[in-house]
Amino acid sequence: MNTISPVVIEPRHGGEHHSVNVKYGIIIFAISVIHILFFLLVKFIEINRWKSNGRFNKSLWKLNNTPTWMLITLWILIIFFIGGANITEFSEEYITIAKRYGRIAYCLLPLNIYLILRPTNCVYLKPGYYLENLSLHKWLSRLISICTLIHAIGYFYKWNKEGKILIKSFRFLNFLGIVVFVMFAVLIIVSIRILRRKYYSLFYIIHNITAWSMVVLIIFHARPGVTIFGIICLILMCYQLLYLRFYKSYPVNNLKIVDIPMSTLQIIKIPKPSNFPTWLPGSHVRLNYTTSNIKSWINSSHPFTIANIPEDGVNYLSLVIKKPGNFIIDQYLTYLLTGPYISIDYPFYNSANLINIICGGSGISFGLPILNHYKSLNSNIPIKLIWCVRNRNDCFIMNQLDMTNVEVFITSAGDSSSDEQSPSSSSYQPVPLFVVDDEQDESHAKVEQTQGEEEVDGLLNQDENGIPLQSMKKESFPKKEEGEDEEKSSKDVFKYGRPKFDEVFAIDDPTLNPNYNDSWVIACGPDQLIEDAKYWSQEKGYRFFSEKYEM
């Protein structure tokens, strides 16, 4: 009698191998939670200690600002070892590795979304200083893309080897994964720096569609399921997109635009919402279109630093912005405003004993409120602010903001060589200030025309003919008295060339012996300006802080 051997039917996903990778996803998520809690705790301790003893703690600050390359290297090592754990024969278990990297990619999403959360006016928690997290978010996104790519390559190889690549690709649940993979491939291309900067709106749309698609579609695509991680991601994304937009935003209208034709800058005055909280100097807000405007959903909100301080007692927020920009403000539209968002750790304002600030172009909106804050306190702390512009017409903003004691450099080679071209020059024509609003009491200024010089990166890379600066007050634009030497007046207002840090930031009081642990250099502007200021601050032993608005 023939005995029929029982046929063992292997489960579709490989029996125990079907769920073998679940624990590795949980491990990645657990490490992500540890990462979040660790830096939350470090930031909280740093702020509290700094506040309580009035001393900047270098060790805690370094720990809180661990270099991105170091964190990403650590994550690469973690992913590499977890991705290859218990794999003995790559040629036989490559599909297990492919599955594992797909799960790793998805389980990293909660951390990556957390890094871009923007709670407003949150002084004790790491997300309150969300700008500190953006670099890590970018690189972690790239790491997730690589894990996704490994997952896709593994499966395409397997299906091609079996001769079923088309059949398997168009099975519904598999097809969902392919859709996400294609989106990631496109996102990687438009994320290339030159393309991202040129087509930022396109990049932003693809970025958001890819993010939402991955979170939602992979919930159905992944087997075993990743529902719990998907729910966490959706909660975080809904907070960012919906809660901040509908419950923590302020509708603003009747904006006032102060401008002159030849300037590269303009001032936007936004009526301060009645319940808008007090903000720290250097804080910024974000503007977006209202929810009824399609642009609100497909374009990013835009950050602008508040150039005035609460102590000014005015009922509006002043923004200094560069024109033309990707976000053109129309005074007749209503916008949604969120914020304020903090930039510098708030104990800085109670502990610094010497501050040197250098700003380029619209970066004046970051340095100026810090200067004016200390002036409002009648503080004896030595503080200097240097403002560098290429276009002399940009100085019209001095009639709109309190820029007393701001020292100004005109770095344009054209202006420098013409020294100069004074108001008495035959090429000089007065350019009246115009205000796009109904107010009649705005100041008027006469400023000189240039040949359309634009502010560019490398603002300070001009000839090193730096001239020691002198203070520049709002009164530096006086109405000319009859018989006044106009050429001399013009030269007194501006200095030309590149500022020499050793000269402009020289300590005026020879008896002053500053505590370098709480002495600061602050820079805001183009990359080259920031790099120069950082190098000088390190040479002198100062603490350094910089502000960039680019992604």
Curated annotation (Swiss-Prot):
Its EC number is 1.16.1.-. Residues 247-369 form the FAD-binding FR-type domain. The keyword Oxidoreductase applies. CDD domains: NOX_Duox_like_FAD_NADP. One of its GO terms (biological process) is reductive iron assimilation. Residues 440-492 are annotated as: Disordered. Residues 472-492 have a biased composition (Basic and acidic residues). Pfam families: FAD_binding_8, Ferric_reduct, NAD_binding_6. Keywords: Electron transport, FAD, Flavoprotein, Ion transport, Membrane, NADP, Oxidoreductase, Transmembrane, Transmembrane helix, Transport. Its main location: membrane. InterPro entries: FAD-bd_8, Fe3_Rdtase_TM_dom, Fe_red_NAD-bd_6, FNR_nucleotide-bd, RBOH/FRE. Residues 102-217 form the Ferric oxidoreductase domain. It is a multi-pass membrane protein. It is an enzyme of class 1 (oxidoreductase). GO terms for cellular component: plasma membrane. It is found in: Membrane. Belongs to the ferric reductase (FRE) family. AIM14 subfamily. PANTHER family: METALLOREDUCTASE AIM14-RELATED, NADPH OXIDASE. Probable cell surface metalloreductase. May be involved in iron or copper homeostasis. This is Probable metalloreductase AIM14. It comes from Candida tropicalis (strain ATCC MYA-3404 / T1) (Yeast). The lineage of its organism: Eukaryota, Fungi, Dikarya, Ascomycota, Saccharomycotina.
